[in-house]
Amino acid sequence: MESRSKVKTYGKNRRYINKDIEIWASLDERPCALKPRNIENFNNQERSDLEHIHSKPKKDSLLSWNILLKKGSYKENELLAKRNQNLVPTVIIPASPRDNASKSVVSKKEVVNLSSSVALSGKPANNSKLDPLHRLLQIVAQEDALPFSQFVKSQTFEIQKIGEASYSEVYQASNADDVPVVWKVIPFGEDGQAQYADVLNEVQISQWIKVDGFANLHQVVVVKGTYPSLLLEEWDRYLMQNGSENDRPDSYSSTQLYCVLCLDHSGTDLEHFELRSWRECWSVFYETLKILSLVETRYEFEHRDLHWGNILIRKADRSEEEVSFLLNEISLDDIESVDFPGSQDKADDFDNILQVTLIDFTLARASYSQGIISYNEFNDPDLFNGVDDYQFDIYRLMSRVTKGRWAQFFPITNVLWLHYLIHQLLHKKNLSSPLTETETLMRSRLKQIFRLIDPVKTMQFQQAEDSIRSKSTVTSATSLLNWVRQKY
């Protein structure tokens, strides 16, 4: 097929049809970590926030952090990678599959990068002799790629294109029970397309992690062939209504490969979801924090690409009685004394008014049984050269922290993305100044945590020593969650 020279658009969200199906604004973005500031003097700052109920949040000049957020040189990244390529990372991994977060983590055994053919321990991986396609087929339990058109005919009753990203098309398909399922269709293997390592990483981590807060994976299928006419019709309809930045997929040859991920429809991405209150903003942050803490503990998980296109939101499934009780009959002053129905964690139940789902694990890192890990090697220089959005500064921060050691576990990368998330909630969702004590307190919490985990204040880069020092006691999503629960 004709080579596509399109530049990757990491983190640049695409347009959607309407608010009902504005989901997954950026499903194919490319995914990057820190160390520990003493937690002091926040009470005075919080009281100051409460006194200025009608004041608007100041616009942060995040892109002016020159010494910290300087664009990374790709050659520098290459040198760092070469410097560490012969080292065996001191990675902490689970000794066996994790069913709950209470199990302890033990020292590593054999560490295997499933998106590479080399075991980090120096021993060949079990599937290292397989070419990338057959390794992917092995993971999804297929002997060969299925004909694309045959797969579509066997699966769908109704289908509609609802979005796109640089490397994929997103469709909503209804199954036999009329339950909506999202298809993420990823052409891969050719120039200008997703690479095998990217697809392997996302598929493997999606299969490993089965927790609330991650989209339920129904099926992964590798297919081959020209683009089915049914999907082309939907592609054209979407183009007429919304435009498209992707090439029309009719140019794909009969040998073109695709990976199709079939997942639950989990809501609207945060960029397009309309938040109506500071309480809802707090709910988005707190639910995201809890999810990250859980998977950090169970799987040594780092998302490494948690921009607001990869956070899906929908209203929490609650009965009318629960909603009435939580939102109408109590105030924040009552939280510590009220007996909440059906929950032993009062604060969690009160804050859980929205349901959050994290998606897109292309750049993520996770551990599984017997020392096996999956991660992305961040080989694309474009990832570290983005401008005009705090998201791109986070990639550079992660690069400074990891120094090319992407296999290792740096949970503070999750804290970096939580700082980005609070920035988006405070400054990009256009909420009005709070007018009630409850709303003021919710915004005050976010601003307090924003200061607490500010990487400019908590990280000290020692350029001469080529090292990083941290002054913070918050070094992971788990430690931040513990702090939040103790504080509030």
Swiss-Prot record:
It catalyses: L-seryl-[protein] + ATP = O-phospho-L-seryl-[protein] + ADP + H(+); L-threonyl-[protein] + ATP = O-phospho-L-threonyl-[protein] + ADP + H(+). ATP binds at I162, G163, E164, A165, S166, Y167, S168, E169, V170, K184. One of its GO terms (cellular component) is nucleus. Residues 156-488 form the Protein kinase domain. Its EC number is 2.7.11.1. GO terms for molecular function: ATP binding; histone H3T3 kinase activity; protein serine kinase activity. Pfam families: Haspin_kinase. Its main location: cytoplasm. It is an enzyme of class 2 (transferase). The active site is at D305 (proton acceptor). One of its GO terms (biological process) is intracellular signal transduction. InterPro entries: GSG2_C, Kinase-like_dom_sf, Prot_kinase_dom. Keywords: ATP-binding, Cell cycle, Chromosome, Cytoplasm, Kinase, Nucleotide-binding, Serine/threonine-protein kinase, Transferase. It comes from the Eukaryota. It is found in: Cytoplasm; Chromosome. Belongs to the protein kinase superfamily. Ser/Thr protein kinase family. Haspin subfamily. Serine/threonine haspin-like protein kinase involved in cell cycle regulation. Acts in chromosomal passenger complex (CPC) targeting to centromeres by phosphorylating histone H3 at 'Thr3' (H3T3ph). Interacts with pds5 and swi6. This is Serine/threonine-protein kinase haspin homolog hrk1.
